[in-house]
Amino acid sequence: MALSISMNAQAQTTNSRFAAKESLSLTNEWDKTFPKSEKVMHEKVTFVNRFGITLAADLYRPKTVNGKLPALAVSGPFGAVKEQSSGLYAQRLAEEGFLTVAFDPSFTGESGGSPRYSSSMDINTEDFCAAVDYLSCRKDVDSERIGIIGICGWGGIALNAAALDPRIKVTVAVTLYNMTRVTQQGYFDSMDEEGRYQLKKQLSEQRTEEFRKGEILPQGGLPDVPTDDATEFLKQYIAYYKSEKRGYHSRSLNSNMGWNITSTLMMLNQNLWIAASEVRTPVLIVHGEKAHSRYFGEEAYQKLTSGKYADNKRLLIVPSATHCDLYDGGEGNFIPWNEIVDFVKRSIK
């Protein structure tokens, strides 16, 4: 009996340790969809989340600023990689004096995790918290001045992380989606309960078939060219993710074969923003006036300001901007850099 107790104690001690880092294959060349800034230093870094998945990130640090810096973790859009929009935001904020990391979420890009091209709101929220772990323990970071920026679906995930983790002192959610709402209700809330049931049935049957064959299948991704009846926002996605001159990247699942077919199943029973009214720290919601997703930003702002912590929340609508214009600026340079930088600096001064 004593031996059994001793063995159990040893097992508990062993299991409580962080997982060893996965061996990742990281590129060394500059393979971003945006030009390299001469104002910042860049390096690849890795860190492990609480699910044992090793995340790969690009770290940007201003060349002319020393000492402990305020820091930001950046991710998104949903299905993108750090070489796309999140890297652009991270590099631009580093030019403003922040140490930043743009990371690939679990199961995607250069990060670890298997099966590939899977999503989980729990694990992805943990990805943000793991980035805060990493930043908090860097000697060149002021651990009391850490924030996060989420783009598209990762804007919604950022709100969930902010509600969970008081170490996050400021949050910026750009052109955000509520991934659980759009999964459960469809675009513009077009799906009813029967539609949800049929989707659950379809995805559950897909799971059975995949288990039988031992293979998890991708959705197929965006078409290279939109059909005549494609929605305007689908055309905008294609124009960004499929264009070599704009946002295409070989490791981006949005640019290629897309998410796993069953990846969204668990979102059908989740409420990502259930604690949004409890976010005490400042939040800036940035959305385009003409974005198909604007209603998600307005929903987020309503939830954030429905409780007693409303005073430090702001909704910024960018005139004439669409959803994807805020990925890279679009043709009108729509990203409101000055407003974002000012909000973050004032919030964590």
Regions found by a protein language model. Give the residues of each.
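Short beta-strand element of the alpha/beta-hydrolase
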Residues: 67-77
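Conserved alpha/beta-hydrolase
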Residues: 92-112
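Alpha/beta-hydrolase-fold enzymes
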Residues: 159-243
